Amino acid sequence: MVNKIPNTDLTLVDTPGLIPKGRISDMVCQDCNLNIVPSKEISRMTFKMKPNKVLLFGGLMWIKMLEVEEQNEEEKVKPIFTAFASKGVVFHETNEDRVEDMIKDHTGGILTPPCNNCKDEYRELAFKKETWTLDTNEELVFKGLGWISVKRGPLKIEINAPEDAEVILRDAFITPKRAR
């Protein structure tokens, strides 16, 4: 649909139905999509996790903390990061050895989204593992779901997400008043 805007040289072109690729929110049912896409205030939680701990974003994807090899014992600091997503997405911290059981037994229950209606179809998607190292004031975006922002780095993680999910590294939108 093309509309000429009166009293201007502007023309508005509407392209309904064009869906950008790579959004996790498009890989679930409509009800889950409504829970993933923020409509009001978003949820945020700050974490200071040890290596081999895992943070689940509902039953949609998870990130595992890895050890940063470059640091010597005197320089070792625990990374601090904040996770952001819609209030409809549950953050859950667990041990690495419990992830498979948590996903199998609790997706659609305490781990939402996905819901019981689309969890089986979602689990059939091919998943990928990627390793990322982020520095202070960098963010990793999980397109169509949320992001993490590193407050104190370096943060080395392994992400487990659907193969078609796009992951983007960017500078932090909001930075602390002073770097630590």
Language-model regions, residue ranges each:
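Helix-rich effector regions associated with P-loop NTPase G domains
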Residues: 1-180
